[in-house]
């Protein structure tokens, strides 16, 4: 059986886009969502600041990620959990307990995203030799930054424009 090695161009850009978008959802979009839903600034600051904890403690649980299963398994599983978490946020908004429910889902997103970061970086290190790692470090960083820009700027702008259009139509 042949050992087929896929081109890093086939997976590095999308892997690092997928790494950046959930981070933006947890750290930026959660704050905007809670502000638009009428949560007080004090509560927003207190509860959303705790959402950063999974990224802070990544070094403590990364050895467990290295021991259990493969990096690819962790990447795929975390991407599925992130997708479910993003859908979960949408389902929690119309509830009467949206703040508590969405905060729990944002916690799931934060831990899934931080675990995805560990697995993605580990997969990158295993799949590429040192020369390829040196070549792709800028590409990986660029696509992560594109995800940050798209999540913070583009998505927020589009949603704000969409919201304003609906408010204008409602006032007619």
Language-model features: locations:
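Central cavity-lining transmembrane alpha-helices of secondary-active solute carriers
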Residues: 46-63
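Glycine-rich segments within core transmembrane alpha-helices of 12-TM secondary carriers
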Residues: 138-152
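Small-residue (Gly/Pro/Ala) motifs that create kinks and tight helix-helix packing interfaces
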Residues: 151-159
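Cytoplasmic membrane-interface "Motif A"-like loop-to-helix N-cap segments
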Residues: 67-79
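Hydrophobic core of transmembrane alpha-helices in multi-pass small-molecule transporters
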Residues: 98-116
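Conserved small/polar residues in nucleotide/adenosyl-binding loops
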Residues: 161-170
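C-terminal ends and interior cores of transmembrane alpha-helices
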Residues: 80-96
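Helix-loop boundary and gating motifs at the non-cytosolic
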Residues: 4-51
């Amino acid at each position: 059986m042949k050992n087929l090695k896929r081109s890093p161009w086939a997976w590095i850009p999308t892997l690092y886009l997928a790494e950046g978008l959930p981070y933006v959802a947890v750290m930026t979009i959660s704050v905007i969502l809670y502000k638009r839903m009428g949560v007080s600034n004090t509560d927003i600051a207190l509860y959303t600041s705790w959402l950063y904890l999974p990224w802070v403690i990544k070094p403590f649980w990364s050895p467990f990620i290295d021991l259990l299963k493969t990096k690819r398994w962790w990447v795929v599983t975390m991407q599925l959990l992130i997708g479910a978490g993003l859908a979960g946020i949408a389902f929690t908004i119309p509830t009467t307990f949206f703040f508590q429910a969405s905060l729990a889902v944002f916690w799931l997103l934060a831990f899934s995203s931080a675990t995805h970061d560990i697995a993605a970086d580990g997969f990158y290190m295993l799949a590429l030799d040192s020369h390829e790692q040196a070549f792709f470090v800028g590409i990986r960083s660029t696509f992560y930054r594109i995800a940050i820009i798209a999540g913070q700027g583009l998505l927020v702008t589009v949603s704000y424009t969409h919201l304003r259009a609906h408010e204008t139509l409602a006032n007619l």
